[in-house]
Amino acid sequence: QQVEETKGSDIATEEKEVVEEVPDDGKFHGKWIVDAEYAIGRIGAEDTLFVDSRGEKQAIMGTIQGAVATVWQDWAIQEGKAGDENWGCILEPEALAEKLGSLGITKDKEIILLGETANGWGDDSRLLWELLAAGYTDVKMVDGGLNAMKEAGAATQFLASNPQPAEVTIDKIDYTHVMTTEELQKNYDDYKIVDVRTDDEYNGAILYDEAQGGHLPGAIHIRYTDLFQEDGTLKPNKELVQMFEEAGLSKDDAIVAYCTGGIRSSYMQLVLEMCGFENSYNYDQSFWRW
């Protein structure tokens, strides 16, 4: 895997202009985020597929009408155990294409991902992050996740729907927003590191069979849960940008987000990017490997 060069200054300027034009209405606005009302309007549409990132076991207790279910682990290399070389990295193009095809997740459909947001680990964002890397463009997450849709009156069902398999081709994986262990070790001082785990994890607790406790040297601590309001929806753009800047981040920085296995940190990376911190990366192997 190689980390590609960052975007040009023209794109960065463009991003900043977009952020400045965001409505100040108490909601988050971003190209990969839709609200529950929009998502409800897409239920039953032939060109839209809902994907429940909590997996089939959770979908048994209720999911959105027509949704298929999957888990991030099935989209990642799982050879060996957590912390082993390549464990948790994005599948190679052919293997990922086969997995997505088996779920009917094709590039000609609008893909809307569902998760548990603040109460989960960002499973929906990890899938979206991988779809972007695989060349998908019409992909979105629901702000507030499944709960927001249920509260807004979405039609639900017990059990996930049976997928309609289709042919999927992925030419390559785009590593623009992927950080590797090798690159981070080689050029550590070039990056600002953001640890998105809980206070206990940051301060040394070993909760998920990590090889050691603590955090990466000099890591800034911005909890994954700090992204959300009490109802599980994202905080407004302006509030998030202020939080990032007060933590010591600048839109000119190269920023690496990490957690335990690159799940919660994928949400952080996507939100950073949508807020104009374009030069941001998700370290998919994260603390398990480090």
Question: Whereabouts are the PLM-identified features?
Answer:
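Solvent-exposed loop/turn segments at secondary-structure junctions
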Residues: 55-58, 73-77, 117-121, 146-149, ...
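Helix-loop module immediately N-terminal to the HCX5R catalytic loop
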Residues: 79-107, 224-255
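A mid-sequence, solvent-exposed acidic-amphipathic segment
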Residues: 193-216, 220-233
